[in-house]
Amino acid sequence: MISRQHALNSYIIFFEQMKREDLVRLPEFFADQARFKDPFNDVTGIEQINKVFHHMFEVLDTPKFIIYEAVLESDVAYIKWNFTGASNAKQLKFVGLSRVVFNDRGLVSEHVDYWDASEQFYMKLPVIGSILRFIRNKAAN
């Protein structure tokens, strides 16, 4: 049985070094029926998780996670990260937090990402972004 600390360390290294060709290694880290959730996806199972990451590599140039803090308490880890990538020649950069649950075998049974999709994506869309900026400004006053 793998220790959860070792599982977390391996998971962090995988995410920081992940490339499209590494997606075949997802079963080394995720339980068969693991759940992955972020602001755009809520999927269950390695095949569906693979599709989420495959899509990320299709739509973004050089996506990269840089993990700068991780805390493990029992079977739950909280991981703070920076994400960078480019889409249509526009550079993306944002901070996020992941809550990751490990099972008894050291595999991820749940990975939930928290980050502000409205600021990172929707605010940059021409029509929707203008509306959201207007609403945000009105709410601030």
Where are these regions (language model features)?
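Short histidine/acidic/glycine/proline-rich micro-motifs that form metal-
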Residues: 13, 40-42, 85
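Generic detector of well-ordered alpha-helical segments enriched in charged/polar residues
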Residues: 8, 12, 50, 129-136
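Short, low-complexity N-terminal intrinsically disordered segments enriched in polar/charged residues
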Residues: 1-24, 28, 138-141
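A solvent-exposed, acidic/Ser-Thr-rich amphipathic alpha-helical stretch
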Residues: 24-75
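A beta-strand edge to alpha-helix "cap/lid" segment located at domain peripheries
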Residues: 58-64, 68-141
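A short alpha-helix capping/helix-coil boundary motif
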Residues: 1-4, 32, 76-77
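Soluble or luminal CAZymes and related metallo-dependent hydrolases
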Residues: 6, 48, 92
